[in-house]
Amino acid sequence: MGKTMAEKILSRASGEDAEAGDIVVANIDVAMVHDITGPITVQRLEEMGVERVWDPSKIVVLFDHQVPADSVEAAENHKIMREFVEEQGIEHFYDVREGVCHQVLPEKGHVRPGDVIVGADSHTCTHGALGAFATGIGSTDMAAVFATGKLWFRVPETYRVEITGELPEGVYAKDVVLKVTGEIGADGATYMAIEYHGEVVREMSVSDRMCLCNMAIEMGAKTGMVPPDEKTLEYVKKRAGTEGRPVEPDPDARYEAELTLDVSDLEPQVAKPFSPDNVVPVGEVEGIAIDQVFIGSCTNGRYEDLKVAAEVLEGEEVHDDVRLIVIPASREVYHRTLKDGVLEVLHEAGALICPPNCGPCLGGHMGVLAEGERCVATSNRNFPGRMGHRESEVYLASPATAAASAIEGEITDPRPYL
């Protein structure tokens, strides 16, 4: 019997002939913490009596959740991590200016096909878009990784998702992954690796594939993965200077479950409160009044996302009753959209453009919702209280749908604007 991508990568990293269900101890290629999970990791290391990390060149420390510091506590956490970085000689440290971890890691060449990547953040699964086995872990497990460079895994079963057909105009990767999430359900792929296949995926940019893999965790999955191809290798070689160790699933690999989705007639999708799998076509929620629109996050804060939003908003104005918050996912994205006029279009339409950060997505700052308020967001979660008050509501959508909704002051089909 052949192997899936997850089985192949964990076999290589553990030195064993690993199959789904096996328990293995794998060598870690990259370990990442941010400003919220990092201080807890440091505390656990101290409790374990560990004085030196296993390899300062394989650890990435990054600030993105509370940047600029939104409280004294956040500032103290930043200070703790800056001191830890200096003390341990951590080679890859990105302070408050660089952006959201799941955008910065691939940009800076820390994601390579075939790697085992762990991050103390649940959306680490994003990096499977480049052919890595990438998954989120807790701060205590991360402390063990910092100390030993190893971590145990139960090798996951794999859910094969094939996307066929051709995307209609006004329908994007976010609409596809929302539809997939609605089909599989919030716990339909629990602890599995989701492998994405099909001509639609092959036509997608690396950024769009990252959007697909980012929401694997919203289906309960351990990770999302896309088999590496020429686009992958071109991106990685440019960023990391190497093609990594790309693997593809064998033709006779065993899959726990399979889904084939023809997107030829797919409409823009929206996830209603209070779960990412509560997905309907935009027409079913069109006309619901909103107070805020958030375009950004590790799901949809990339260049292509902001460019689409600008295409919708060009020559238009944000509705008087709506706050449009735009947050590029990284300094690189910010710079590119600034240079080519995308941010100018968004600014002229009435958007509030913020520095790269995770703030509103986790209900931290730069866009927290009050009781009874509604937001259309391009992020990945809409649980009660996710973006602020527990009685607020979040509707998940593509950047195009979000931008059109900002113009109308209500949830809106973006296709007439394109």
Curated annotation (Swiss-Prot):
Cofactor: [4Fe-4S] cluster
Cofactor descriptive note: Binds 1 [4Fe-4S] cluster per subunit.
EC number: 4.2.1.33
GO biological process, alphabetically ordered: L-leucine biosynthetic process
Pathway: Amino-acid biosynthesis; L-leucine biosynthesis; L-leucine from 3-methyl-2-oxobutanoate: step 2/4
InterPro entries for the chain: Acnase/IPM_dHydase_lsu_aba_1/3, Acoase/IPM_deHydtase_lsu_aba, Aconitase_4Fe-4S_BS, Aconitase_4Fe-4S_dom, HAcnase/IPMdehydase_lsu_prok, Homoacnase/IPMdehydase_lsu, IPM_dehydratase_rel_enz, IPMI_cat
The reaction(s) this protein catalyses: (2R,3S)-3-isopropylmalate = (2S)-2-isopropylmalate
Keyword line: 4Fe-4S, Amino-acid biosynthesis, Branched-chain amino acid biosynthesis, Iron, Iron-sulfur, Leucine biosynthesis, Lyase, Metal-binding
Binding site for [4Fe-4S] cluster: 298, 358, 361
One Gene Ontology MF term: metal ion binding
HAMAP family recorded: LeuC_type2
Quaternary structure (record): Heterodimer of LeuC and LeuD.
Protein family per UniProt: Belongs to the aconitase/IPM isomerase family. LeuC type 2 subfamily.
Function (record text): Catalyzes the isomerization between 2-isopropylmalate and 3-isopropylmalate, via the formation of 2-isopropylmaleate.
Protein name, as recorded: 3-isopropylmalate dehydratase large subunit 1
Species: Methanopyrus kandleri (strain AV19 / DSM 6324 / JCM 9639 / NBRC 100938)
